[in-house]
UniProtKB/Swiss-Prot annotation:
Catalyzes the attachment of proline to tRNA(Pro) in a two-step reaction: proline is first activated by ATP to form Pro-AMP and then transferred to the acceptor end of tRNA(Pro). As ProRS can inadvertently accommodate and process non-cognate amino acids such as alanine and cysteine, to avoid such errors it has two additional distinct editing activities against alanine. One activity is designated as 'pretransfer' editing and involves the tRNA(Pro)-independent hydrolysis of activated Ala-AMP. InterPro entries: aa-tRNA-synt_IIb (IPR002314), aa-tRNA-synth_II (IPR006195), aa-tRNA-synth_II/BPL/LPL (IPR045864), Anticodon-bd (IPR004154), Anticodon-bd_dom_sf (IPR036621), Pro-tRNA-ligase_IIa (IPR002316), Pro-tRNA-synth_IIa_bac-type (IPR004500), Pro-tRNA-Synthase_IIa_type1 (IPR023717). Keywords: Aminoacyl-tRNA synthetase, ATP-binding, Cytoplasm, Ligase, Nucleotide-binding, Protein biosynthesis. The gene is proS. This is Proline--tRNA ligase.
């Protein structure tokens, strides 16, 4: 590619509305342009990277035995009603009607469509297992699109769906997808982790996320220092403390706390250790519990894990916190004065709360707290469950080592769906025993456009993007100095350009009539890994300058050795 015949579209200034570095650099490098909130046009440089990612994904999916299909973006509403997700999915599902007043959706995912297809095409266990994938545009009406293509409303995704008659068969395909995903992200030279995760709205029994480690990530990922345990913080179990509850040393007393409506204010004003305080959170109770609200207790320095709380049978789904009006109607006090003593509601305490002694909590009277609370003496120990997020230093759930926490960007997710969709949609085959059997399913997603942003978050400096070779828009940039005035510079540039292309190298020749500083800055900004600078002075000694974008080192290479040298440097 020649810059004179290419839309480079680089920008010097950082856009004011771009929050994260990947969004800033994708705009500055001329990869994307915003059309509307959460909607982006991909420019040539962006498309080149997107296609490189897409090709790696496709190759590894084919290697793993998956079969490519293409399904419509527009899906009839009756499939979503049949699966039960029409009501469950919420406002992120964009719904509309056609001219015949028939309801449709723009697909955020394709479980319903593929299940509908396969129940009409497959009728015997002999035809299974099968795994189908597509790389296609999806749409989710995000309430707050942000971070550029990281959380866009329209995005490119690889989604795959497998069908089986046994759990063992599903596990085999699940393991194959796990391996394929690991190969995909390894080929892209990304620093990633596969972590245990919650199944979320997709459903199912088991799931792993593939997280690219980056400080800008939205997810907290926990790792064990003593094993290969890794999980999303939403999923990680907080083990019960091993030490027994300390005996009571304080008397129960009620204290005036008119200016302490939060744990932080209570700790500051009364010099209490925060680990000696308890937060009482009221949420809506499950309708079958016979109560409107249920109280959840976590230690003052811990955060409630809403995913864990929502799974409790006593808690309504989705988890909803009680409003101040509901709290006052039930308790007679505001949210800042709640506590477990004399509380006339069902109570569930976190495991760490169950071993506390001499702790402080609200007195269920505005402006008052109890100090010196002790279980069994002042109130009965309630139901105990794992309610909190783990913190650094916790014992790993597998009992090996302690936990560390890092930030991650989710780029892939695999699920064992089981029969959630096939049962709801009556997707059956004739089993080995001659009877109809509901198929078991798995699903496997990669955010193709999100991978591009995640790679930038992990590979950049103050001059621009530093692409891994495998997904760079161009592998080599040829920068001829004053080629329009020097015949031998132009001749070598053209010869090198032709030769590299004949070797299958993606190369960009900067043939613009631009100052060298502009040419260097643009190639650094768009992240070309290998740069060759051709100048008259160096040609006197039959040399050119090579610069590696990642390490920043320059070295002189003989003109007769350039091609061989570049082929040895490029990771292919």
């Amino acid at each position: 590619m020649r810059t004179s015949q290419y839309l480079l579209s680089t920008q010097k200034e950082t856009p004011a509305d771009a929050e994260v570095i990947s969004h800033q650099l994708m705009l500055r490098a001329g990869m994307i342009r915003k059309l509307a909130s959460g909607l982006y046009t991909w420019l040539p440089t962006g498309v080149r990277v997107l296609k490189k990612v897409e090709n790696i994904v496709r190759e590894e999916m084919n290697n793993a035995g998956a079969i490519e299909v293409s399904m419509p973006v527009v899906q009839p509403a009756d499939l979503w009603q049949e699966s039960g997700r029409w009501e469950q999915y919420g406002p992120e599902l964009l719904r509309f009607v056609d001219r015949g007043e028939r309801p449709f959706v723009l697909g955020p995912t394709h479980e319903e469509v593929i299940t509908d297809l396969i129940r009409g095409e497959i009728n015997s266990y002999k035809q299974l297992p099968l795994n189908f994938f597509q790389i296609q545009t999806k749409f989710r009406d995000e309430v707050r699109p942000r971070f550029g293509v990281m959380r866009a409303r329209e995005f490119l995704m690889k989604d795959a769906y497998s069908f089986h008659t046994t759990q063992e068969s599903l596990q085999e395909t699940y393991d194959a997808m796990y391996t394929a995903y690991s190969k995909i992200f390894s080929r892209m030279d990304l620093n990633f982790r596969a972590v245990l995760a919650d199944t979320g709205s997709i459903g199912g029994s088991a799931s792993h996320e593939f997280q690219v480690l980056a400080e800008s990530g939205e997810d907290d990922i926990v790792f064990s220092t003593g094993s290969d345990y890794a999980a999303n913080i939403e999923f990680a179990e907080a083990l019960a403390p091993t030490e027994p509850r300390a005996p009571a040393t304080e008397e129960l007393r009620i204290v005036d706390t008119p200016n302490a409506k939060t744990i932080a204010e209570l700790v500051e004003q009364f010099k209490l250790p925060i680990e000696k305080t308890v937060k009482t959170l009221l949420v809506h109770a499950h309708e079958e519990s016979g109560h409107k609200l249920v109280a959840l207790l976590v230690r003052g320095d811990h955060d409630l894990n809403e995913i864990k709380a929502e799974k409790l049978p006593q808690v309504a789904k989705p988890l909803t916190f009680a409003s101040e009006e509901e709290i006052r109607a039930a308790i007679g006090a505001g949210p800042g004065s709640l506590g477990p003593v004399n509380l006339s509601l069902p109570v569930i305490a976190d495991r760490s709360v169950a071993v506390m002694s001499d702790f402080g909590a609200g007195a269920n009277i505005d402006g008052k707290h109890y100090f010196g609370i002790n279980w069994e003496r002042d109130l009965a120990l309630p139901l105990v469950a794992d309610l909190r997020n783990v913190v650094e230093g916790d014992i790993s759930p597998d009992g090996k080592g302690t936990l560390q926490i890092k930030r991650g960007i989710e780029v892939g997710h695999i699920f064992q769906l089981g029969t959630k969709y096939s049962e709801a949609m009556k997707a059956t085959v004739q089993g080995e025993d001659g009877r109809n059997q509901v198929m078991t399913m798995g699903c496997y997603g990669i955010g193709v456009s999100r991978v591009v942003a995640a790679a930038i978050e992990q590979n950049h400096d103050d001059r621009g993007i530093i692409w891994p070779d495998a997904i760079a828009p161009f592998q080599v940039a040829i920068l001829p100095m004053n080629m329009h005035k020097s015949f031998r510079v132009k001749e070598l540039a053209e010869e090198l350009y032709t030769t590299l292309r004949s070797h299958g190298i993606d190369v960009i020749l900067d043939d613009r009539k631009e100052r060298p500083g502009v040419m260097f800055a643009d190639m650094e900004l768009i992240g070309v890994p290998h740069n060759i600078v051709i100048g008259d002075r160096n040609l006197d000694s039959e040399e050119v300058e090579y610069k590696n974008r990642r390490v920043g080192e320059k070295q002189m290479i003989k003109t007769s050795e350039i091609v061989e040298f570049l082929l040895s440097q490029i990771k292919r």
